[in-house]
Structures are given as C-alpha cells and as structure tokens.
C-alpha cells in the first residue's frame, strides 16, 4: 500500500459527506448508525467503539488505527479485514484516501 501523505482536509470533508456520512458520525457522543461513530478512532484498536456490535473479523484483526492503517483499510476494506460488514468498496485513488484520512484525523479528535 501507498504511504500516507497529508492531503486536503476540505476535500476530505466533502468525500466524508458523500461516501461515509450515511453510515458514520464523527462528533463526540455522536450516534452509531449502520457503522460505528468514529470519534477517537485514531490510536484505538479495531472493533472497540463502545456500544457498537462488530463482526468477529473486526475484533480479531486488532489493528491499531493510525493515518497509515486507515488509509490501507479504506483502499479495500473487505481485503484488509475479510469478514467486515462495511459495505463500502473502498477508495482506489491514493489522493482521495489521503484527503479523507486527513479530514478524519482532525474531525474525530
């Protein structure tokens, strides 16, 4: 996978709205939707958002989320965590992943 490089937070916010917001929230105390709330995800292990029902695959992967691991995951979620229930095909363009992860790193703090 490509090394993560800081991208455009503004473009990342737009990508989040069009590709992620239907299933995820980012704000502290935000609700779980089809997917978990992402607040505080960086530095946390996969499958650990309190109150969200994960697949065994997400729990067993036990990856610690960082800009790099998130970028790798978003390239092809089902390949990175076989058995994940995330029904998103991934972001194939490295630039899109960099922009989205740059946005997420700030929006989920």
Swiss-Prot record:
GO terms for cellular component: mitochondrial intermembrane space. The modification N6-methyllysine is found at residue 61. It is found in: Mitochondrion intermembrane space. Disulfide bonds: none annotated. Keywords: Electron transport, Heme, Iron, Metal-binding, Methylation, Mitochondrion, Respiratory chain, Transport. Its main location: mitochondrion. The modification N6,N6,N6-trimethyllysine is found at residues 78-79. The keyword Iron applies. Coiled coil: none annotated. The modification N6,N6-dimethyllysine is found at residue 61. Heme c binds at residues 20, 23-24, 86. The keyword Iron applies. GO terms for molecular function: electron transfer activity; heme binding; metal ion binding. Binds 1 heme c group covalently per subunit. Electron carrier protein. The oxidized form of the cytochrome c heme group can accept an electron from the heme group of the cytochrome c1 subunit of cytochrome reductase. Cytochrome c then transfers this electron to the cytochrome oxidase complex, the final protein carrier in the mitochondrial electron-transport chain. Belongs to the cytochrome c family. This is Cytochrome c. It comes from Wickerhamomyces anomalus (Yeast). The lineage of its organism: Eukaryota, Fungi, Dikarya, Ascomycota, Saccharomycotina.
């Amino acid at each position: 996978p490509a090394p993560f490089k800081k991208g455009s937070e503004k473009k990342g916010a737009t990508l989040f709205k069009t590709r992620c917001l239907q299933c995820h929230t980012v704000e502290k105390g935000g609700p779980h939707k089809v997917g978990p709330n992402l607040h505080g995800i960086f530095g946390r292990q996969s499958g650990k958002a309190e109150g969200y029902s994960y697949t065994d695959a997400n729990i067993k992967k036990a990856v610690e989320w960082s800009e790099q691991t998130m970028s790798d995951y978003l390239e092809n979620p089902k390949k990175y965590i076989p058995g994940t229930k995330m029904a998103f095909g991934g972001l194939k363009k490295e630039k899109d992943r960099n922009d989205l992860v740059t946005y997420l790193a700030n929006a989920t703090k």
